[in-house]
Amino acid sequence: MEVIEVVYEDGVFKPLKKIKLKEGTRGVVVVRLPKQISEIAKKYRIKVREDVLEEFLEERR
């Protein structure tokens, strides 16, 4: 199995790099969309005491 990054344009998946396949070769495409930044941030979030957060917000005003 090979992972190939593609862009979808005009109803066609187009590879972003040159690939070595014979014309007419068939395969299966699995679409995995890039994660949103909010999903990535959830992985690294930590709990903060509410009073510390309030103090931080006050300093920013």
UniProtKB/Swiss-Prot annotation:
Any Pfam family: AF2212-like
Keywords of the record: Toxin-antitoxin system
UniProt keyword ATP-binding present: no
Highest taxon of the lineage: Archaea
Keyword Metal-binding annotated: no
Function noted in UniProt: Possibly the antitoxin component of a type II toxin-antitoxin (TA) system.
UniProt similarity note: Belongs to the UPF0165 family.
Entry protein name: Putative antitoxin PYRAB11980
Source taxonomy: Archaea, Methanobacteriati, Methanobacteriota, Thermococci, Thermococcales
